[in-house]
Amino acid sequence: MTAPFTPAEIAAEGIKPEEYEDIVQRLGRHPNKAELGMFGVMWSEHCCYKNSRPLLSNFPTEGERILVGPGENAGVVDLGDGLRLAFKIESHNHPSAVEPFQGAATGVGGILRDIFTMGARPIAILNSLRFGNLDDARNRRIFTGVVDGISHYGNCVGVPTVGGEIYFDPAYSGNPLVNAMALGLMETEEIVKAGASGIGNPVLYVGSTTGRDGMGGASFASAELTDQSMDDRPAVQVGDPFLEKSLIEACLEAFKSGAVVAAQDMGAAGITCSTAEMAAKGGVGIELDLDKIPVRETGMVPYEYLLSESQERMLFVAQPGREQELIDIFHRWGLQAVVAGQVIADPIVRIFFQGGIAAEIPATALADNTPIYHRQLLDQAPDYAQQAWQWQESDLSPAAIAGIEIAGQKQSWNEVLLTLLDSPTIASKHWVYRQYDHQVQNNTVIVPGGADAAVVRVRPLDAKPEECVIGVAATTDCNARYVYLNPLEGAKAAVAEAARNLSCVGAEPLAVTDNLNFGSPENPVGYWQLALACEGIAEGCRQLNTPVTGGNVSLYNETLDSNGRPQPIYPTPVIGMVGRVENINKVVGQGWRNSGNGIYLLGSNDGNTLGGSEYLAVVHHTVAGQPPQVDFDLEKAVQKACRHGIAQGWVNAAHDCAEGGLSVALAEMAIASQLGAEINLPDSDQRLDNLLFGESASRIVVAVAPEHQPAWENYLAGQSLPWQKLGVVGTAQGNLTFIDAQNNALIDLPVSALTEPWQTAIARRLKS
């Protein structure tokens, strides 16, 4: 019997003492080094979701358009006309913190493999990114490195990066979030799944060679970031986008041949994960001979083979007798392809090396029957939240027509608006997306920054572009400050905003993929945030009929402060949502089209709050209060009206009110069109700063040409939602003017003055 490992050796694999005892009991013996490593990666939070799985079970996962839900490499929805969309979001947070370029690049590569492993051709990439403030040199290095990595991989692989979101906040200093989402188009009914089947069927290793890069990446991603994390740079993988481009084509050709029974990419935990998951999902076993695996380094031992996360690798189960056909396809594309094993009846993963058995573990022990922790939920909100909820608007200085006093200094509303437009979270992300190739494949309908959601034309390979009018819209959304202050309501708001952004381009929301980025679940506060956010997501998705098709959980996003205490990020449940566009020729952006168009607000300002707002954080340097709460009946009514107006051709511009409230939304529409506007604010008992900069759900600003306004207003009169005409689009080089009910000009600025800080905010900070 193998000698027991020391506690330090066990802990080094991320395994708790009680988990090691469980392993010994399951095997009936002590594991060897390779087996211990296999358990370490497969029982990590990154792979088995041992703290989050009970919470995820509450998500709605079924719907009339859902073809594949959670459990496969990606979700799949039915677009109609024989077309299907595969989509998924995943994180690469920890690798991007220690090696920003490669961490972000391989995050893109990994999510693309999830898509084409299903048999779908990748058609778009989106990203949800979070960084610390750019006045810190390390944060600037991480930010520029991540953007470089995303652009390098996406541009080289030939898939357009079409949208996403970027936030900056001290909560992410040293622990960035890099969440990558991808979409893929399927033209056949055949969906490639991961479950192995067919006793005796050959198992093929295809793609790149195996090296020592990415060793233990899954375990690394399941631990807090510390001062020693830079020593874990070998746990960051190195990607080759040109090789991945060949892998995409080879895999799609192989799937089309009908010779592939099942497929699984080698992502987290590499060979260990792909063999265990394929075997467990199929209820069979897999034997694999490591001596057959193509390598790029000499002297590798089983532990290294099994835990390597070298990129651009796949595992196939093939139809018997058709191995050579598949091998020839991959060789033609300049890729490795070998028969490395077979499917067996005994449901175990058996690994051979140099004529002996290197590892032998029941497949379900690695991939299905893993530890699950049911943690106790706090019976009341933690102290930080209760203290934050004590804040009231009356704690601020009075808001007068001339402005507000902040730290002894009078600021006009003009100055406040310019300050918000200069906030990197609100400001233009042009510095970022100008580095992305967003037009490759020639199907991008709206360029990044042009609308509230990305829109891509759905074009089958053999179709003429002019014949294709169906599109797909996609977005990633989460205001993490809301979730920090109230995880339940903040998560609902994230789902609602994602659907609202799709509705702003005229798309019907279909389904969700989620990326749960949180701190340690072993901290009662962290688990409270996670549990309530999951409850909020479930509620939001049920209300809006957008089932969850899968996603990713990234926990232990924490750094240590100067006293060695863990500092978690803001809880950040990113919602990736996709929608169907009936006719891409009717899609609208956020910029006003023409002078003289009417400007309308769908929804009401009555639900505005300064709690958790960008105004409160940026202008008053305060994070407190209750965030906005979603009225889903109102939310659905507002979105329905917006979609209907776009479909009828009445609405020619739409933009939701998010960070910065009504004033920032209108300023962004003015900047996008370079047209001014005169806005008449309604009479209100609200504070002026709440009316101007307060935030709430369920508000969309739209523009309508004069000839369509009677029909539009007649339609709205028959709907059960509040709305009002705010004003009229002005002229080029005009001013954006806000006038209150007493005819006072609260804000009056040339569009050029709005544009300058908004357009240059990020670039200026990078030069500092």
UniProtKB/Swiss-Prot annotation:
GO MF entry, a single one: magnesium ion binding
Residues involved in Mg(2+) 1 binding: 90, 552
One example of a Gene Ontology biological process annotation: 'de novo' IMP biosynthetic process
Active site residues of this protein: 46, 92
Catalytic activity entry: N(2)-formyl-N(1)-(5-phospho-beta-D-ribosyl)glycinamide + L-glutamine + ATP + H2O = 2-formamido-N(1)-(5-O-phospho-beta-D-ribosyl)acetamidine + L-glutamate + ADP + phosphate + H(+)
Residues binding ATP, per UniProt: 49, 88, 514, 551
Recorded metabolic or biological pathway in which this protein acts: Purine metabolism; IMP biosynthesis via de novo pathway; 5-amino-1-(5-phospho-D-ribosyl)imidazole from N(2)-formyl-N(1)-(5-phospho-D-ribosyl)glycinamide: step 1/2
One Pfam family named in its UniProt record: AIRS_C
InterPro entries given in the database record: PRibForGlyAmidine_synth_PurL (IPR010074), PurL_linker (IPR041609), PurM-like_C_dom (IPR010918), PurM-like_C_sf (IPR036676), PurM-like_N (IPR016188), PurM-like_N_sf (IPR036921)
Keywords: ATP-binding, Cytoplasm, Ligase, Magnesium, Metal-binding, Nucleotide-binding, Purine biosynthesis
Gene3D superfamilies: PurM-like C-terminal domain (3.90.650.10), PurM-like, N-terminal domain (3.30.1330.10)
Gene Ontology CC annotations of this record: cytoplasm
Residue numbers binding Mg(2+) 2: 114, 265
Family according to the record: Belongs to the FGAMS family.
Quaternary structure and partners: Monomer. Part of the FGAM synthase complex composed of 1 PurL, 1 PurQ and 2 PurS subunits.
Protein name, UniProt field: Phosphoribosylformylglycinamidine synthase subunit PurL
Phylogenetic lineage: Bacteria, Bacillati, Cyanobacteriota, Cyanophyceae, Synechococcales
Gene name of the record: purL
